[in-house]
């Protein structure tokens, strides 16, 4: 039994499932999770002293790499002044100005402490601003664990939402409508049925919780037009894609302007931070200037703001996103080439600093239905063989992978060499 195995057994005695977020339990791939002791650059190190090339990056935030000196120095300097004040600080203003500078659609922004908090606050604001109750989300898109967002479609796109987790009343879930990602007709049909009841569309511009599914051409622009036609707000959930796909997020990359944007992950530099922002007239509807209530004890925490600012400033350096995109393309195309070499069918998607691969015979994967038909058993085999090779991927067939600027030629080549060996083994099974 490894030290990670021992720690997992110990953790299960005091922590539900032994983890503080379900995907970490390795339920999607089997076996025991690796307990991590430290991380540096492109690498993480487990409790048994094994070193891995990391393509999880704490699920997205570590875009500069782990333990980056600029972020570490900013945090240590901030700690000298105190950990939390529960009062306004100049750092919050600086952070807000930086976000607004980088994302043109955001005129005002409020800091919170998580992505879930950002999305649930943005939806409450949209409902209050429009005086409408219903929201429209997409099958396979994840926006945090707020009650109204843990809902999936029933049979057919026009079916009222059904809870996808116990503990969510059906009377509450009925206000959440679910359409098919990358299918404008399904969205139009729902709006035709509820033309004056839908407050907002919320969308992952690149769906990163059904692996990695970019929008097809015109999809986001079509959603913008539908929102304008029916007087609904468009919320782009950039918790994952914000400052990872491009300097101005996925909305900048694809050329679409939302009414509200939610942010998280990268914005915190590894600290727990979220944010929501957008049009000034909408943001002025939030307390204390408006009637929609939202608050948070640790919102705008000075340590988190310091870490986030250090990361955001580094991301404004010239050529950063071109480097990141080139590395991501190289690793994704390399995975596909290695799989094809050994006769294993694979589809890939990638954009900016995120990627996904699918064990499927289909040439392209663009929606949740296709994702659910992929070979998850083969993924689990592949996952553990790569883990044995010292490559740490997301332990789920439904999660995106993330590159960092710390991934250099050595790490990329070592990863692809490992993949070649693993695919060779899988081809012989």
From Swiss-Prot:
One GO molecular function term of this record is: glutamate-1-semialdehyde 2,1-aminomutase activity
So which domain of life are we looking at? Bacteria
> Which coarse location class applies to the principal site listed for this UniProt protein?
cytoplasm
Query: What Pfam family is a match, any one?
Result: Aminotran_3
- Pathway, per UniProt? Porphyrin-containing compound metabolism; protoporphyrin-IX biosynthesis; 5-aminolevulinate from L-glutamyl-tRNA(Glu): step 2/2
Question: What is any one GO biological process for this UniProt entry?
Answer: protoporphyrinogen IX biosynthetic process
Would I find Isomerase among this entry's keywords? yes
One Gene Ontology cellular component term attached to this UniProt record is: cytoplasm
Task: Name the Enzyme Commission number(s) assigned to this protein.
Answer: 5.4.3.8
What the entry lists under Gene3D superfamilies is as follows:
Aspartate Aminotransferase, domain 1, Type I PLP-dependent aspartate aminotransferase-like (Major domain)
Q: Does the keyword Cell membrane apply?
A: no
Please give the catalytic activity noted in the UniProt record.
(S)-4-amino-5-oxopentanoate = 5-aminolevulinate
Modified positions (N6-(pyridoxal phosphate)lysine) are: 265
Cofactors per UniProt? pyridoxal 5'-phosphate
Enzyme class, spelled out: isomerase
Q: Which UniProt keywords apply?
A: Cytoplasm, Isomerase, Porphyrin biosynthesis, Pyridoxal phosphate
Q: Where does the record place it?
A: Cytoplasm
**HAMAP family in alphabetical order:** HemL_aminotrans_3
* Subunit organization: Homodimer.
NCBIfam families xrefs: hemL, PRK00062.1
User: According to its UniProt record, which protein family does this protein belong to?
Assistant: Belongs to the class-III pyridoxal-phosphate-dependent aminotransferase family. HemL subfamily.
Q: What is this protein called?
A: Glutamate-1-semialdehyde 2,1-aminomutase
> Which species?
Shewanella halifaxensis (strain HAW-EB4)
Q: Which gene encodes it?
A: hemL
